[in-house]
Amino acid sequence: MRLKFKVTLKRVERPKVWREITVPEDYTFDQLHTAIQLAFGWTNSHLYQFSDVEIYDKTNPYSESFYITLPEFQSDDIEEEEFYDSTQEHVSSWLTKKGDKISYVYDLGDHWVHEVEFLGMEDTNVRGAHCVAGEGACPPEDCGGTYGFADLKKICRNAGKSKAAKAEWQEYLDW
């Protein structure tokens, strides 16, 4: 059996950036992280975490937040009961119903937020992770998050229009 997910990069529009992936049902969150990295073309150069922080009900004072990440990157700000080891926690234990969602943040500096939605199970014995559908090019690493990416797209659109625009493009390339 395999788990099927739609992973959508949030706060990036025109075009939307999303991937549909399938992974074996025994995958841990660390393995899901690797599958997402490959599907989006990220280079796995930064820290990551899964959590409910971006999606939990902030109007409900009893809503708990949690973090699933590598143990060596556990923050002192996070209480022990809120932290889970991504190499030990199986995705299938957390996302059990069609439509269940979790937030995946890659690069805690640029803060690329992805919504991971569980689409259901597939009855197949294909091995490994697979990207089966998608849309939109993934932003480049270290471009400054959503705001930096918006600036980069503007620079690219204007690069040939004036000397100042060409200089701005060159400055970005040199950075």
Regions found by a protein language model. Name each.
Residues M1-W175:
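Short linear regulatory motifs enriched in tryptophan with gly/pro/ser
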